[in-house]
């Protein structure tokens, strides 16, 4: 009979409408004969083909259901009347099971007898019987049944009534792991995995139970005639999670790994796992990790990278102490590095595993110089170069390789080798990658290799163009690294400077200096690091301007002149340079005054904007130059004294003192040199703004003149004094004589100073000062005598 599906509705099954004569839907009997010839054509193993075992008469199933329903009803009635007693199972542990519910369902008889569903489904379901009659609430609150109710029933529990509700003991787990039966191994894995992932290994089995479990897990990794890939994969994951946690007890688990590895490495100790010794847990894992296209390959590599790169493990097995230099340790170092580099050479190795191998090489090379030398001899730098060329779409691998390259290129030999292979150009070709973290690592490595002399032999035109485009970025780290790379890349190669000028690097650098306040409004977790980055950007941009305007003999003068003209034509350059000379640190002051001096000497018209331009503290440029010169001269003297008394200081502290002394010396020389130019050749207003503080005795240049001055400072200082005292208006006011009189200088001082100096320019200028001072003193004396005579005549 045809039944309209749209008009047929499923009815809820209740005790009132239950009819045991109705066939259950839990099992559909197969017709006696195939309904069509199509069924006859099906293959013999098809579940839809008529089989002998399901060719039973259809009425036998109905009779079976009738008998089961009668039994269910009787058991249920007995339980509702309170006369049903749960049977006591054999053994010490009592297991209580409820009778099947009168409700017909698709659940099997085994399901109703399971420990969980006997209480949860049968007792708590609204479709079941009234539980108050049987005092069910008191019954289930008795331990240990309450704990069973607190756990959510899973499908696996319903399907497997023998599934355990409590953790296995350590001996049971070890026995199951050592078993060759898959079901036993799987049971141990199911018992271990959730507890280990939750960090409860020691709390559950204690140290005495956890250590044998770890040994048994490693024994699972030893190749067997019959093994399951999923079991091996899970063993790797459990071992990985056991050393991954960072709680207080993790060191206790680490020591279990250490003891097992030490036992394997000891050639004279008792046998372990029936493997030839010396051996190690690293080799156990590597044996599995090298098996490609398996389910456990990636899990093995993840465990290996943690065993190699975890700081505590590196300290114990890969350090440089004498305890790590035994033959067994040296053998381990060699095997691990050869495995990692061999994996990089194999074309069939997955990109993820290559990235993990790169991390192993990087961390172990950082920890142990011997391992680093071993890696270099095996050609690891060339392998890194190949990865950067070929694996351009795998971000994780590129990122790990860039970190390792930065470490290895810190050595001049490796960095030079990488640059000579064209590595700098390869790195610049990846600057368009969309990953920010990869871009950071690329620029870090570029900044390091661009400081090597080997870069001057490379054609970096296209690379420079790519880097210049990045310095306008809003990312502080990218701007710092990009400007640092440009600073280094133009230091050794004159052609690189010319390429930078052609790409308009002067305008870009000034724009970054002008808009650098945008970085101060960006939120940052580490404020101190953030400030250091911003200061580094300032110094890098000013250094770039200093490099491209340099006119040393090895530089291209036309390129430097072009850079000076570009700076002079920039409307913001004067304000920017004056600002950083005024409020910057000593590095910024030194670089800013150097650039100003070069540009004004090359393009004299660049001095005009400074005539009316005031600094942040409202002083004009000449006053600022003189103030900074006096301040740096004082710092130079103090630092020189410290240098003489630094016998007990470290080499780094002495280098810092020497660097500070040189910076202050350069500030004095270039500030005074620029003042000389402004007062002798530029707009007269520069001298007039300076004349007032010179004549009132506030800043007398002779007061700072000492025998301790270096030749460089003394030459610029004397040239400045002669330039301001040789002007017509200065000669008319006898400025030289006034300075000498205020400072109480004598000819004997200048004669002694002249005798100590071998520089002919200094001797010539000292002679001019002596002659001019003597001449003006004579004129002043004559005028004074004439004034006295006139006064005497008036009195007469």
UniProtKB/Swiss-Prot annotation:
Disruption phenotype: Worms exhibit premature cell cleavage during embryogenesis, symmetrical cell division during gonadogenesis and undifferentiated intestines. Embryos show a defect in centrosome positioning that delays ABar spindle alignment and appear to lack endoderm. GO terms for cellular component: adherens junction; catenin complex; cell cortex; cytoplasm; nucleus; serine/threonine protein kinase complex. Residues 17-59 are annotated as: Disordered. One of its GO terms (molecular function) is transcription coactivator activity. Keywords: Activator, Cytoplasm, Developmental protein, Nucleus, Transcription, Transcription regulation, Wnt signaling pathway. It is found in: Cytoplasm, Cell cortex; Nucleus. GO terms for biological process: asymmetric protein localization involved in cell fate determination; canonical Wnt signaling pathway; cell fate commitment involved in formation of primary germ layer; cell-cell adhesion; embryo development ending in birth or egg hatching; embryonic body morphogenesis; endoderm development; endodermal cell fate specification. SUPFAM superfamilies: ARM repeat. InterPro entries: ARM-like, ARM-type_fold, Armadillo, Beta-catenin. It comes from the Eukaryota. Antagonistic role in the Wnt signaling pathway that operates in embryogenesis. When located at the cortex it has been shown to inhibit Wnt signaling during asymmetric cell division but when relocated to the nucleus it shows positive regulation. Has a role in blastomere signaling during endoderm specification. Component of the beta-catenin-lit-1 complex which promotes phosphorylation, down-regulation and subcellular relocation of pop-1. Within the complex, activates lit-1-dependent kinase activity. Can substitute for bar-1 indicating functional redundancy. Interacts (independently of ARM repeat) with nhr-25. Component of the beta-catenin-lit-1 complex (also called the lit-1/wrm-1 complex or the wrm-1/lit-1 kinase complex) at least composed of lit-1 and wrm-1. Interacts (via N-terminus) with lit-1; the interaction is direct and activates lit-1 kinase activity which leads to the phosphorylation of pop-1. This promotes pop-1 interaction with par-5 and translocation of pop-1 from the nucleus to the cytoplasm. This is Armadillo repeat-containing protein wrm-1. It comes from Caenorhabditis elegans. The gene is wrm-1.
């Amino acid at each position: 009979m045809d039944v309209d599906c749209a008009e047929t509705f499923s009815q809820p099954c209740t005790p009132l409408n239950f009819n045991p004569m109705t066939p259950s839907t839990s099992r559909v009997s197969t017709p006696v004969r195939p309904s069509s010839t199509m069924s006859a054509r099906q293959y013999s193993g098809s579940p839809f083909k008529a089989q002998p075992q399901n060719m039973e008469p259809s009425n036998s199933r109905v009779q079976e259901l009738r008998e089961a329903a009668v039994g269910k009803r009787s058991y249920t009635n007995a339980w509702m009347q309170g006369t049903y007693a749960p049977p006591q199972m054999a053994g010490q542990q009592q297991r209580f099971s409820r009778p099947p519910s009168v409700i017909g369902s698709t659940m099997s008889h085994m399901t109703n007898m399971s420990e969980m569903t006997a209480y949860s489904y049968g007792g708590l379901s609204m479709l079941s019987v009234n539980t108050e009659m049987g005092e069910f609430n008191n019954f289930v609150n008795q331990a240990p049944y309450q704990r069973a109710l607190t756990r959510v029933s899973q499908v696996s529990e319903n399907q497997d009534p023998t599934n355990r509700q409590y953790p296995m003991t350590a001996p049971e787990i070890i026995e199951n792991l050592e078993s060759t039966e898959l079901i036993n191994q799987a049971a141990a894995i199911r018992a271990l995995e959730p507890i280990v992932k939750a960090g409860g290994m020691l709390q559950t089995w204690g140290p005495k139970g956890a250590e044998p479990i770890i040994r048994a897990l490693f024994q699972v990794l030893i190749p067997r005639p019959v093994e399951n890939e999923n079991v091996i994969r899970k063993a790797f994951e459990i071992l990985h999670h056991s050393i991954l946690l960072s709680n207080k007890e993790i060191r206790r688990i680490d020591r279990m790994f250490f003891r097992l590895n030490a036992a394997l490495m000891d050639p004279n100790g008792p046998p372990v796992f029936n493997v030839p010794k010396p051996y190690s847990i690293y080799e156990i894992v590597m044996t599995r990790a090298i098996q490609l296209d398996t389910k456990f390959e990636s899990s093995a590599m993840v465990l290996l990278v943690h065993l190699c790169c975890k700081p505590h493990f590196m300290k114990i097995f890969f350090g440089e102490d004498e305890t790590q230099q035994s033959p067994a340790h040296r053998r381990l170092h060699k095997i691990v590095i050869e495995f990692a580099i061999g994996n990089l050479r194999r074309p069939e190795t997955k990109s993820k595993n290559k990235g993990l191998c790169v991390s192993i090489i990087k961390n172990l090379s950082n920890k142990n110089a011997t391992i680093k030398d071993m890696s270099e001899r095996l050609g690891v730098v060339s392998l890194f170069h190949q990865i950067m060329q070929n694996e351009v779409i795998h971000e994780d691998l590129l990122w790990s390789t860039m970190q390792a390259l930065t470490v290895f290129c810190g050595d001049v030999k490796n960095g030079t080798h990488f640059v000579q292979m064209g590595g700098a150009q390869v790195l610049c070709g990846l600057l368009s990658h969309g990953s920010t973290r990869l871009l950071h690592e690329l620029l870090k490595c570029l900044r390091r290799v661009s400081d090597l002399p080997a870069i001057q032999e490379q054609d970096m035109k296209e690379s420079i163009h790519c880097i210049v485009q990045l310095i306008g970025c809003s990312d502080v780290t990218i701007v710092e690294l990009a400007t640092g790379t440009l600073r280094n890349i133009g230091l050794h190669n004159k052609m690189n400077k010319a390429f930078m000028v052609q790409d308009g690097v002067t305008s870009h650098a000034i724009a970054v200096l002008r808009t650098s306040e945008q970085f101060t409004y960006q939120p940052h977790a580490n404020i101190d690091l953030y400030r250091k980055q911003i200061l580094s950007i300032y110094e890098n941009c000013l250094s770039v301007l200093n490099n491209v305007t340099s006119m040393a003999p090895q530089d291209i003068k036309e390129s430097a002149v072009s850079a000076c003209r570009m700076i002079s034509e920039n409307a913001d350059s004067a304000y920017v340079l004056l600002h950083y000379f005024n409020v910057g640190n000593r590095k910024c002051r030194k670089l800013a005054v150097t650039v100003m001096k070069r540009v004004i000497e090359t393009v004299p018209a660049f001095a005009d904007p400074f005539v009316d331009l005031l600094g942040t503290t409202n002083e004009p440029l000449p006053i600022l130059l003189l103030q900074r010169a006096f301040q740096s001269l004082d710092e130079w003297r103090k630092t020189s004294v410290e240098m003489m008394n630094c016998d007990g200081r470290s080499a780094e502290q002495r280098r810092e003192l020497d660097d500070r002394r040189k910076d202050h010396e350069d500030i004095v020389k270039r500030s005074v040199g620029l003042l000389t130019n402004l007062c002798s050749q530029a707009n007269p207003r520069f001298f007039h703004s300076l004349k007032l503080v010179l004549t009132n005795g506030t800043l007398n240049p002779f007061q700072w003149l000492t025998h301790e001055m270096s030749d460089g400072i003394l030459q610029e200082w004397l040239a400045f004094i002669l330039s301001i005292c040789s002007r017509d208006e200065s000669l008319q006011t006898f400025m030289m004589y006034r300075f000498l009189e205020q400072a109480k200088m004598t000819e004997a001082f200048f004669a002694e100073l002249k005798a100590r100096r071998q520089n002919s320019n200094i001797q010539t200028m000292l002679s001019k000062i002596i002659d001019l001072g003597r001449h003006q003193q004579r004129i002043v004396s004559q005028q004074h005598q004439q004034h006295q005579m006139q006064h005497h005549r008036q009195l007469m």
